[in-house]
Amino acid sequence: MSKAIIKFVRLSPTKARLIAREVQGMNAELALASLQFMPNRGAKFIANAISSAVANGGFEPEEVVVTSCRVDAGPVLKRFRPRARGTASKIRKPTSHVMVEVSKPEKKEA
């Protein structure tokens, strides 16, 4: 089993979790292929984490399975936008931590 962590990704954790759920349990090669054609911005970051986890373990993508794909919330960058009548409103720029674990599938005994 090997893992990869990408921290402080400028992406909302709720949007990234939608993609992470799709990939969990998939073959790594199939997951990378499906992420390549997803229109979401977070798909690129999760694909990078999967390929990094595969490389960290010294595996080939076709021989491993994505056992766990987690997206945790990171710190929120707070900014202000000027508004009417001299007021200001808050802008929240959320960040995420992407954690991916890959391992070889266990052989089922018949």
Swiss-Prot record:
<dbReference type="InterPro" id="IPR047867">
    <property type="entry name" value="Ribosomal_uL22_bac/org-type"/>
</dbReference>
<keyword id="KW-0689">Ribosomal protein</keyword>
<keyword id="KW-0687">Ribonucleoprotein</keyword>
<dbReference type="InterPro" id="IPR001063">
    <property type="entry name" value="Ribosomal_uL22"/>
</dbReference>
<comment type="subunit">
    <text>Part of the 50S ribosomal subunit.</text>
</comment>
<dbReference type="GO" id="GO:0003735">
    <property type="term" value="F:structural constituent of ribosome"/>
</dbReference>
<dbReference type="GO" id="GO:0019843">
    <property type="term" value="F:rRNA binding"/>
</dbReference>
<dbReference type="InterPro" id="IPR036394">
    <property type="entry name" value="Ribosomal_uL22_sf"/>
</dbReference>
<feature type="compositionally biased region" description="Basic residues">
    <location>
        <begin position="84"/>
        <end position="95"/>
    </location>
</feature>
<comment type="function">
    <text>This protein binds specifically to 23S rRNA; its binding is stimulated by other ribosomal proteins, e.g. L4, L17, and L20. It is important during the early stages of 50S assembly. It makes multiple contacts with different domains of the 23S rRNA in the assembled 50S subunit and ribosome.</text>
</comment>
<keyword id="KW-0699">rRNA-binding</keyword>
<comment type="function">
    <text>The globular domain of the protein is located near the polypeptide exit tunnel on the outside of the subunit, while an extended beta-hairpin is found that lines the wall of the exit tunnel in the center of the 70S ribosome.</text>
</comment>
<comment type="similarity">
    <text>Belongs to the universal ribosomal protein uL22 family.</text>
</comment>
<dbReference type="InterPro" id="IPR005727">
    <property type="entry name" value="Ribosomal_uL22_bac/chlpt-type"/>
</dbReference>
<keyword id="KW-0694">RNA-binding</keyword>
<dbReference type="GO" id="GO:0006412">
    <property type="term" value="P:translation"/>
</dbReference>
<dbReference type="Pfam" id="PF00237">
    <property type="entry name" value="Ribosomal_L22"/>
</dbReference>
<protein>
    <recommendedName>
        <fullName>Large ribosomal subunit protein uL22</fullName>
    </recommendedName>
</protein>
<feature type="region of interest" description="Disordered">
    <location>
        <begin position="84"/>
        <end position="110"/>
    </location>
</feature>
<dbReference type="GO" id="GO:0022625">
    <property type="term" value="C:cytosolic large ribosomal subunit"/>
</dbReference>
